[in-house]
UniProtKB/Swiss-Prot annotation:
Entry GO terms, CC: mitochondrion
Organism: Danio rerio (Zebrafish)
GO biological process: negative regulation of oxidative phosphorylation; respiratory electron transport chain
Superkingdom per UniProt: Eukaryota
UniProt-recorded name of the protein: LYR motif-containing protein 5B
InterPro entries according to UniProt: Complex1_LYR_dom, Complex1_LYR_ETFRF1_LYRM5, ETFRF1
Lineage: Eukaryota, Metazoa, Chordata, Craniata, Vertebrata
Gene from which this protein is expressed: lyrm5b
Length: 84
């Protein structure tokens, strides 16, 4: 029987992998950590726990997006405004 969360987990993995390209410590570092995190939970069968892990992954996606937006904002502010 196929796991009903398979597509959602794959989408989350792809989204995180895409966001990891601009990670401050480097894409290779991020990719290794991401792969290890997903491999650690590969045998999970409890639907409630899987939902919880997916929610946590979506939270990480939002945090990474916020990190990147903040970094871009700081770079623009640094270029166009004088130091206070």
């Amino acid at each position: 029987m196929a796991n009903p969360f398979r597509a959602e987990v794959k989408q989350l993995y792809k989204a995180l992998l895409f966001l990891g390209r601009e990670y401050p410590k480097g894409a290779d570092y991020f990719r290794e950590r991401l792969r290890a995190a997903f491999a650690k939970n590969k045998d999970m069968r409890d639907p409630d726990k899987i939902k919880q892990l997916i929610s946590r992954g979506e939270f990480v996606v939002k945090e990474l997006e916020a990190l990147y937006y903040l970094r871009k904002y700081r770079a623009l502010k640094k270029r166009y405004y004088e130091a206070e």
